[in-house]
A protein has these predicted regions:
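Membrane-cytosol interface segments of multi-pass membrane proteins
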Residues: 1-163, 255, 287-325
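Aromatic-anchored segments of alpha-helical transmembrane domains
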Residues: 16, 20-23, 91, 158-172, ...
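Juxtamembrane "helix-exit" motif on the non-cytosolic side of transmembrane helices
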Residues: 30-32, 100-105, 167-175, 220-228, ...
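Interfacial loop-to-helix transition and helix-capping segments at the boundaries
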Residues: 42-55, 116-132, 169-189, 220-243
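Long hydrophobic alpha-helical segments that form multi-pass transmembrane helix bundles
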Residues: 151, 156-199, 203
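Alpha-helical transmembrane segments and terminal signal-anchor/GPI-anchor hydrophobic tails
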Residues: 183-187, 198-260, 268, 275-283, ...
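Transmembrane alpha-helical segments of multi-pass membrane transport proteins and ion-pumping complexes
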Residues: 190, 194, 242, 246, ...
Length: 325
């Protein structure tokens, strides 16, 4: 499979946006001082836009798997074991840290409680992605088989998934529709990525992608208080994620060692950045609001990003832990 450097750029960009979103949220939700209500509104609205880079990760998975000639269960099980290992090492560490922040003590019971949180999925919010990816990899060989069909079949399957996992659940708020498809919209995002890999999208469509993105953002602003934008399966937000990927994918990117290095570190940065955020806001109780709030958040974001990339770069040099990141 020929490497597409634009996908590496998309992966890095999405990772940085996730870090930025988390830095912005803690500024208002973990502030040691009262927060201006108007500032909170602005932060939450911007984070709602940023949130829609998360489905792009699933689209990338589908895009890359469709480019592979084969996808065996032995390959997928190795990845599943890796993610399970991440949960019971990195996830367990995060659970222990959180319990120490809450209980201000560390003992044998702390470890037992932390283990329970890993099993029950009660970790820091960003770890939901790890649990979801495990589920995706368990069915990835089946998805790969579908993505080897003709273009018409792939488009049909992807369209049906959009209707039954994205559109109908949304419309059900107003019109009860009895037909159900027992899968979440994550499966649609994976199939959409695979469909894009099989279809030659035209570069002169980037203006159309940009227009759709702009319309989605305008809609989100006007209907901010009506719809549940935190749900990553909202139809308008879904269109936003799809067009973000299509637009970014068309960017011409020159091969670069720095780009490949940062892309290889992105997964680890996604995993580890909340550790630095939580230590800063819960341990050192830093204040990101008040005067020059936006500048403080920007500096905080840059600091967390540099710490995360630097830490993961070092950790990947250690044989015993590099497979986790």
């Amino acid at each position: 499979m020929k490497r597409e450097y634009s996908i590496d750029l998309v992966r890095i960009t999405c990772c940085l946006f996730v870090v930025l979103g988390h830095c912005m949220l803690v500024s208002i939700h973990q502030s040691p001082v009262p927060v201006d209500p108007m500032f909170s509104v602005w932060v939450e609205q911007l984070v709602l836009f940023i949130r829609w880079v998360v489905p792009v990760f699933f689209i990338i998975t589908g895009y890359c798997i469709a480019k592979k000639k084969t996808c065996t269960y032995s390959y997928c099980f190795l990845h599943v074991l890796k993610f399970i290992e991440v949960l019971f090492t990195v996830g367990l560490f995060f659970a222990i840290i959180e319990l120490v922040f809450i209980e201000r003590t560390l003992n044998g019971f702390t470890f037992v409680k932390a283990l329970g949180k890993v099993v029950s999925g009660q970790l820091w919010d960003h770890m939901w992605f790890v649990y979801t990816v495990i589920g995706i990899y368990l069915v990835l060989p089946v998805i790969h088989c579908f993505l080897q069909q003709d273009i018409k079949s792939i488009i049909t399957i992807t369209t049906l998934l959009f209707i039954f996992t994205i559109l109908i659940p949304y419309l059900d708020k107003w019109i009860h529709i009895g037909i159900r498809f027992p899968f979440e919209g994550v499966l649609f995002y994976v199939f959409f990525g695979g469909a894009v890999a099989k279809i030659n999208t035209k570069k002169n469509w980037r203006y159309i992608y940009s227009l759709i993105l702009a319309l989605c953002m305008v809609y989100m602003v006007f209907f901010l208080k009506i719809d549940n934008w935190e749900n990553i399966f909202h139809p308008v937000g879904c269109l936003m994620s799809m067009n973000l990927f299509l637009l970014w994918k068309e960017i011409y990117v020159k091969p670069s060692k720095v780009l490949l290095t940062l892309s290889g570190l992105s997964w680890g940065v996604y995993l580890i950045h909340p550790f630095f955020i939580n230590v800063a806001v819960k341990g050192f109780r830093i204040n990101l609001v008040g005067s020059l709030s936006w500048l403080k958040i920007l500096i905080f974001f840059c600091t967390i990003s540099l710490l995360s990339f630097g830490t993961v770069y070092i950790l990947k040099k250690i044989p015993m832990v590099k497979q986790l990141f």
